[in-house]
UniProtKB/Swiss-Prot annotation:
Catalytic reaction annotation: [protein]-peptidylproline (omega=180) = [protein]-peptidylproline (omega=0)
N-terminal signal peptide: 1-20
Residues covalently joined to lipid (S-diacylglycerol cysteine): 21
Region (Disordered): 297-342
Positions with biased composition (Low complexity): 331-342
Function: Plays a major role in protein secretion by helping the post-translocational extracellular folding of several secreted proteins.
Enzyme superclass (EC): isomerase
Lipidation feature positions (N-palmitoyl cysteine): 21
Name by which UniProt lists this protein: Foldase protein PrsA
UniProt biased composition (Basic and acidic residues): 306-330
EC numbers: 5.2.1.8
Gene this protein is translated from: prsA
Annotated PANTHER family: FOLDASE PROTEIN PRSA, PEPTIDYLPROLYL ISOMERASE
């Protein structure tokens, strides 16, 4: 899914790049009595929200590529390219058609992948994992377990499967006959997963980790958040391992969890982007895009407004202080006069 999204985003950027980088007077289309130039097209699309997003991403990726591009190897790019291709083909699509639909060639797509990889490298360069981060990761961690699963379409089917197993049915045989999970069905539902695995839904992991060896779960409902379809699972635990109290044997896994958690934290990501844009001295020259990066950087007008507010606040505080001092002096003088008259 991630590669699919990258491909789609790359397509949007490719269209915008074409308009932004081509000669403004060049004709894109001609017709009787009129033409459409690159400038016409650019002025039309730049106000659209998708163009604002594409521009924002273009600037961010360019900044990160300039600074972190040398950390990305051709091997990294080819690996990401192959993964994207495999994913499209696994879903029955043709990769060349997907590229054409996005307005890309293999060369331009690889360029986009390099920018994305440089962006990822830039985020990782800012990572600082604390002991608190590790403790948080440890709290939700569960070591890898060995289990068997049966996936079915309805709750009634799941209840029927559970009853069949309870009545002495062989789990492996039932999985091969009735499970709809194509990845595990042939092997009798056998699967391994830990708390970070994406091969099984979170609901299934949560229920499975509570099972003892040999125990079979009740039907578990799991909703796919992309399709909003609910499927049902019955799980048999083969080998469940308690993590204990010592984090050290799982140090590598815990650190990875902490890093992934921070990289998914939008506050962290926004701060990194903001710092990098500031360091690169990014200036927006076209008013149509002055707010495209507003979430990451202050515009000159907003900065001036902020300074003006601070100045007013400071003047107000100074005035209040002077007034207070004057009142104190008047009060003191009054008391002195009263004392003299007495």
């Amino acid at each position: 899914m991630k590669k699919k999204l990258i491909l789609a985003a790359a397509g949007a950027m490719a269209v915008f790049s074409l308009a932004a980088c081509s000669s403004g007077s060049k004709d894109i289309a001609t017709m009787k009595g009129s033409t459409i130039t690159v400038d016409d097209f650019y002025n039309q699309i730049k106000e659209q929200s998708t163009s604002q997003q594409a521009f924002s991403q273009m600037v961010i990726y360019k900044v990160f590529e300039e600074k972190y591009g040398d950390k990305v190897t051709d091997k990294d790019i080819q690996k990401n390219f192959d993964e994207a291709k495999e994913q499209v083909e696994a879903q029955g699509g043709k990769f060349s058609d997907a590229l054409k639909q996005a307005g890309l060639t293999e060369k331009t797509f690889k360029k986009q992948l390099k920018q994305r990889a440089a962006y990822d490298a830039g985020l990782k360069a800012h990572l600082k994992i604390t002991d608190e981060d590790l403790k948080t990761a440890w709290a939700s961690f569960h070591p890898e377990v060995e289990a068997q699963i049966i996936q079915v379409a309805s709750e009634d089917d799941a209840k029927a499967v559970k009853k069949e197993i309870t009545d002495g049915g062989d789990f492996t045989k039932i999985a091969k006959e009735k499970s709809t999970d194509t990845a595990t069905k042939k092997d009798g539902g056998k699967i391994k997963f830990d708390s970070q695995a994406t091969t099984v839904p979170a609901e299934v992991k949560e229920a499975a980790f509570k099972l003892k060896d040999g125990e079979v779960s009740e039907p578990i409902a799991a909703t796919n958040m992309q399709t909003y379809q609910t499927t049902y699972y019955v799980v048999k635990m083969t080998k469940n391992k308690a993590k204990g109290n010592d984090m050290k044997p799982y140090e590598k896994e815990i650190k990875k969890i902490a890093e992934e958690t921070k990289l998914a934290d939008q506050t962290f990501v926004s701060k990194v982007i903001s710092d990098e844009l500031k360091a690169a001295n990014v200036k927006i020259k076209d008013d149509a895009f002055k707010n495209a990066l507003a979430g990451y950087m202050q515009t000159e007008s907003s900065s001036a407004s902020s300074e003006k507010k601070e100045s007013k606040s400071s003047d107000s505080k100074t005035s209040d202080t002077k007034t207070s001092d004057s009142e104190k002096a008047t009060d003191s003088s009054s008391k002195t006069t009263e004392s003299s008259s007495k």
